[in-house]
């Protein structure tokens, strides 16, 4: 998984590495293009389906499952999946796997303990998502949850000394404005609301979830950059801590009720779908994101907002008014602008600036044209668009 770099984007070894695909035969290039669009489809479906499935499972009539048990089950399945992947990497040799895990988890215990912090935050974040989606329409949650881009960017600047372009700062302001409009529409919108839903609680939960996502994602990225452990090993360690911490949270919040009614109380096929999506969704994205760049991830998030909104209209009777459409449009535009590579951002900035006559250079006749920069994609280094938590959520 060395190809997965910071923020889940494709790692680049140098200027030539990005453009290497252009030098491959047409068949290889076409296959890579197909994989990119498959990645886009997978990201769109995963982003939208998780939110919609949680909303659907939490609003079904009848006995409601305990969200804390779903979080624990997702961590267990995620950890087992990573264990199987590591087992496959060791070519099915149990002895080699045991020795590897003993060395990586127990002998290097300080590295393992570093994962306790992001694991605690991710466990909290997953529980907050259930609270938020239970109290907000799926489309409203999907739009508001894009604040994680803002929090991730701010924590990246503070913790990793990362610099953002002026276009990215402008897109973050646009993002905040769009979310504020959507929340204003939610607060002032008419129409009956279910009695068991509290938009204020939902907003507080989604903001706390975005803050935790931003911090934990950047913290996890810092750990990955400072160590040689594989992504699957780190996810296994996170799964171990996540399971333990999730059980503690379950006992503290709903221990008596779970003991009385059972761990799997209220579980239906829809609930199992949520658990599987939460467990395997992030791991699936970790694989397919190898073939997708930041622009595709921006499109995926934007399209998932549209898909969530359309599905919410059909499934939950969600009403889209002009204020929501304006806010969602600003968020979609901000997501796309933020995900643009630096080269494209500079092109947009230069295109918007006035050009003067002396700056226009005419090539004298008879001389070969200067080398084109388009064959050198060194400027296509991108800032992380999604937090590293895309690998573990």
UniProtKB/Swiss-Prot annotation:
The chain crosses the membrane at residues 3-23, 37-57, 65-85, 97-117, 140-160, 169-189, 200-220, 238-258, 269-289, 315-335. Its main location: Golgi. GO terms for molecular function: antiporter activity; UDP-galactose transmembrane transporter activity. InterPro entries: Nuc_sug_transpt. It comes from Bos taurus (Bovine). Belongs to the nucleotide-sugar transporter family. SLC35A subfamily. It catalyses: UMP(out) + UDP-alpha-D-galactose(in) = UMP(in) + UDP-alpha-D-galactose(out); UDP-N-acetyl-alpha-D-galactosamine(in) + UMP(out) = UDP-N-acetyl-alpha-D-galactosamine(out) + UMP(in); UMP(out) + UDP-alpha-D-glucose(in) = UMP(in) + UDP-alpha-D-glucose(out); UMP(out) + UDP-N-acetyl-alpha-D-glucosamine(in) = UMP(in) + UDP-N-acetyl-alpha-D-glucosamine(out). Interacts with SLC35A3; the interaction is reduced in the presence of SLC35A4. Found in a complex with SLC35A3 and SLC35A4. One of its GO terms (cellular component) is Golgi membrane. It is found in: Golgi apparatus membrane. The gene is SLC35A2. It is a multi-pass membrane protein. The keyword Cell division does not apply. Residues 353-393 are annotated as: Disordered. This is UDP-galactose translocator. GO terms for biological process: UDP-galactose transmembrane transport. Keywords: Antiport, Golgi apparatus, Membrane, Sugar transport, Transmembrane, Transmembrane helix, Transport. It comes from the Eukaryota. The lineage of its organism: Eukaryota, Metazoa, Chordata, Craniata, Vertebrata. Transports uridine diphosphate galactose (UDP-galactose) from the cytosol into the Golgi apparatus, functioning as an antiporter that exchanges UDP-galactose for UMP. It is also able to exchange UDP-galactose for AMP and CMP, and to transport UDP-N-acetylgalactosamine (UDP-GalNAc) and other nucleotide sugars. As a provider of UDP-galactose to galactosyltransferases present in the Golgi apparatus, it is necessary for globotriaosylceramide/globoside (Gb3Cer) synthesis from lactosylceramide. NCBIfam families: nst.
């Amino acid at each position: 998984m060395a190809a997965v770099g910071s923020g889940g984007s494709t790692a680049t070894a140098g200027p030539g590495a990005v453009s290497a695909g252009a030098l491959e035969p047409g068949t290889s290039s076409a296959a890579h293009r197909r994989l990119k669009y498959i990645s886009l489809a997978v990201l769109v479906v995963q982003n939208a389906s998780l939110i919609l499935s949680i909303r659907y499972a939490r609003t079904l009539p009848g006995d409601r499952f305990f969200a804390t048990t779903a979080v624990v089950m997702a961590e267990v399945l995620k950890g087992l999946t990573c264990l199987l992947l590591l087992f496959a990497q060791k070519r099915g040799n149990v002895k080699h796997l045991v020795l590897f895990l003993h060395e990586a988890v127990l002998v290097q215990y300080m590295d393992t303990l570093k994962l306790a912090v992001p694991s605690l935050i991710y466990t909290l974040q997953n529980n907050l998502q259930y609270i938020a989606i239970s109290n907000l329409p799926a489309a409203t949650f999907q739009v508001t949850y894009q604040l994680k881009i803002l929090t991730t960017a701010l924590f990246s600047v503070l913790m990793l000394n990362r610099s953002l372009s002026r276009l990215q700062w402008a897109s973050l302001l646009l993002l905040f404005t769009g979310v504020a409009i959507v929340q204003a529409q939610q607060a002032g919108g008419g129409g009956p609301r279910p009695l068991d839903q509290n938009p204020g609680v939902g907003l507080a939960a989604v903001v706390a979830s975005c803050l935790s996502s931003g911090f934990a994602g950047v913290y996890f990225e810092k750990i990955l950059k400072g160590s040689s452990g594989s992504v699957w090993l780190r996810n296994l360690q996170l799964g171990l801590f996540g399971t333990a911490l999730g059980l503690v949270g379950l006992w503290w919040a709903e221990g008596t009720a779970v003991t009385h009614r059972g761990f799997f109380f209220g579980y239906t096929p829809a609930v199992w779908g949520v658990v599987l999506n939460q467990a395997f969704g992030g791991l699936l994205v970790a694989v397919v994101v190898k073939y997708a760049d930041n622009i595709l991830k921006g499109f995926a998030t934007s399209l998932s907002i549209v898909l969530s909104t359309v599905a919410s209209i059909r499934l939950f009777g969600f009403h889209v008014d002009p204020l929501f459409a304006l806010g969602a449009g600003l968020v979609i535009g901000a997501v796309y602008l933020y995900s643009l590579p630096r080269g494209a951002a500079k092109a947009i900035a230069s295109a918007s600036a006035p050009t003067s006559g002396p700056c226009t250079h005419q090539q004298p006749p008879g001389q070969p044209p200067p080398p084109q920069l388009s064959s050198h994609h060194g400027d296509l280094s991108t800032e992380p668009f999604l937090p590293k938590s895309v690998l573990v959520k």
